[in-house]
Design a protein with these regions (language model features):
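Flexible, low-hydrophobicity surface segments
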Residues: 1-120, 144-147, 415
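Alpha-helical support elements that line or immediately flank enzyme active sites
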Residues: 5-33, 67-88, 163-208, 212-232, ...
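Beta-strand segments within the central parallel beta-sheet cores of soluble alpha/beta enzyme folds
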Residues: 34-35, 200-206, 233-243, 270-275, ...
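Short acidic, glycine/serine/threonine-rich loops at helix termini
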Residues: 42-47, 80-83, 178-179, 187-189, ...
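Glycine-rich and small/hydrophobic secondary-structure elements
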Residues: 48-77, 213-265, 322-346, 367-390, ...
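Glycine-rich loop/linker segments at domain edges
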Residues: 120-164, 254-338, 417-425
Length: 453
């Protein structure tokens, strides 16, 4: 069977009623369901169990699914969606970071609050960490700059859409084949949502193709196909359309950034202070981790003795954001690199030279306790500037625009100093048999990087 999901045309609304009667009468339709058939919420992180397989009482974004059907073919399933009658009560929408930051007093919170479990109003997560003495660092600076930056979000856009097939066996076990980067998380979510022992569920991660972080959450369509397979006793497949992939999203957060930095006349950074405001969209996803990542990894390229970052992630009535290549770091890195260029102008230094003078050395520990074993950024800058004739082209342009230098970085194995907690962050089990065979059990799903080999 083939499944399709009916999605909300409204960004924020209460669901007053859903009528499946006519859809079930359509020839070729085998089953239909609403959120009341799978009311238990789920999520990728324990602190953000805020997603429903199908929305139960409220939709929080355009594209939120409210009902699903299974039919003999995709065309019949698609047509049956038109037979479903949904009555909504529209609610005010929160569409910007600024609106998400408004206090309880400034809004009719009973109507605009997207999730009741939020820290305050529509603030999902707040973070504040300081390393060193930020005020002392600014006092030591010869130059201080204070800037405001905004990074537009973007999406992963893998060629291969999300797809899942579920089968309910005669023994009562569920098998799910899904284009997922995180089968263990999907397995855990299914056990919770279906109220089944995990031992009765098997999740098989099929060759994913493109993922880029966009297939690292457990998703609604995976829960829905499993329930429909249980309802019908037949295998059920659901493939998202390209439009639905955009609704699913989990792309890079839009971030509003205030940054203040102090620098000595030789170009060394004495203090760096970030305030980041993330537009998280309608659901938690990896948002708590994303909030930490927008601040924690800005110290691994240049030595910074005093560092402070504060961050807030707000809920808005838009597609949920999550992890995308370089999770959480391109946004503040963009701000920092532009800021360094402005400092280079102040000091009348070449932008490349400013960076080369102050690279974090190998085998060092950053102010926020990240360990940098090797840093090849200097060699990279040399090669790029030479191959591109950076100095000649930058100074030779009559407009002085359209040609610049920016550096990015990411650190592997940085879980603990980014998100401080007592939970285990990774593990591996190795088994060696008597014949010399070695079996490795690890939590890394192979999506092309070679984990299986």
């Amino acid at each position: 069977l083939f499944a399709k999901m009916l999605r909300s045309p409204h960004p924020h609304a209460r669901i007053k009623s859903i009528d499946l009667t006519q859809a079930l009468k359509r020839p070729g339709v085998v089953a239909a369901m609403t959120g009341k058939d799978l009311p238990i919420p789920f999520g990728i992180l324990p602190v953000s169990q805020d997603e429903e397989s199908l929305c139960v009482d409220k939709v929080r974004m355009i594209g939120d699914p409210v009902a699903a059907v299974a039919a003999i073919d995709e065309e019949t399933a698609e047509s049956a969606l038109e037979d479903i009658v949904v009555e909504y009560e529209l609610l005010p929408s929160v569409l910007t970071i600024e609106d998400g930051l408004k206090s309880l007093e400034e809004t009719e919170i009973s109507k605009t609050q997207i999730h009741e479990y939020a820290d305050s109003g529509n603030i999902h997560k707040q973070v504040a960490l300081e390393f060193g003495d930020i005020e002392t660092g600014f006092a030591e600076a010869d130059h201080i700059r204070e800037e405001l930056y905004y990074y537009e979000g973007n999406t992963h856009l893998p060629i291969e859409q999300h797809s899942a097939v579920a089968q309910h066996g005669a023994d009562g076990r569920i098998t799910l084949w899904s284009s997922t980067q995180t089968p263990h998380y999907v397995h855990r979510a299914l056990a919770k949502v279906l109220e089944m022992p995990a031992s009765q569920i098997r999740v098989i991660a099929t060759p994913v193709g493109g993922g880029f972080g966009g297939k690292t959450d457990p998703f609604q369509h995976e829960m829905v196909v499993c329930k429909l397979a249980m309802m019908t006793g037949r295998p059920v497949k659901l493939t998202l359309t390209r439009e639905e992939v955009f609704y699913t999203h989990r792309g890079r957060h839009p971030v509003l950034m205030w940054v203040k930095a102090g620098m000595k006349s030789d170009g060394s950074i004495t203090a760096l202070h970030f305030r980041n405001f993330l537009d998280g969209g309608a659901y938690g996803s990896y948002g708590v981790a994303s909030t930490y990542y927008t601040g924690a990894l800005q110290t691994v390229t240049y030595p910074i003795a005093n560092y402070k970052f504060e961050a807030m992630r707000v809920f808005t009535n838009k597609a949920p954001c999550g992890p995308k290549r370089g999770h959480g770091t391109p946004q503040p890195r963009f701000a920092l690199e532009v800021l360094l260029d402005k400092f280079a102008e102040d000091l009348e230094l070449d932008p490349a030279e400013l960076r080369l003078r102050h690279l974090i050395p190998d085998n060092s520990k950053t102010v926020n306790h990240l360990t940098v074993t090797t840093n090849g950024l200097g060699e990279c800058i040399h090669k790029v500037t030479e191959a591109s004739r950076f100095q000649q082209r930058r100074t030779g342009s009559s407009l002085g625009k359209g040609f610049g230098l920016g550096c990015g970085s990411y650190l592997s194995g940085a879980g603990l100093p980014v998100y401080w907690n007592k939970m285990p962050h990774s593990g591996v089990q190795i088994k060696i048999d008597r014949g010399g065979g070695v079996t490795v059990f690890c939590g890394s799903t192979d999506i092309g990087q070679g984990s299986n080999s």
